């Protein structure tokens, strides 16, 4: 993530599937993005406005996903989402990716965080295991049965 341009990424996949159009490839690539209901944005806004926690986004993503999200959500909604976070870390911009430990160390060190006082939510076991080994508290959320808005009612986190 972030080590090649978006066009190089698309061309690499197209070399394996030459019959697929670039548009069809991009649509297929973006189809993996999950729905983001507005009540989650409300939750994030209230969490950010409480000023009780420092909130960061750390995402393995590329420009195709971000461009699609911005286009689909619209600039206003995307801006509202992004403004909930103190810092917005995207793998394609920082040239690091989960689950490599250097991405977690980068965020911890760049923001002078204490791992034991840091809470990381992710839906991928690999990512939470590595973060936990660094002393970070984790919640491997199951997107099929759990919702981040239930963070305070379901987890010992206050």
Model-derived features: where do they sit?
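Asp-based, Mg2+/Mn2+-dependent phosphohydrolase catalytic module
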Residues: 62, 70-158
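A metal-dependent, Asp-based hydrolase signature
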Residues: 1-26
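A short secondary-structure junction motif
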Residues: 1-5, 66-72
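Short phosphate-engaging motifs
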Residues: 39, 65, 127
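Short, acidic loop-to-helix structural element flanking the phosphoryl-transfer center
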Residues: 15, 23-59, 101, 145
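Hydrophobic alpha-helical core bundles mediating ligand binding, dimerization, or RNAP-core interactions
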Residues: 9-13, 29, 62-69
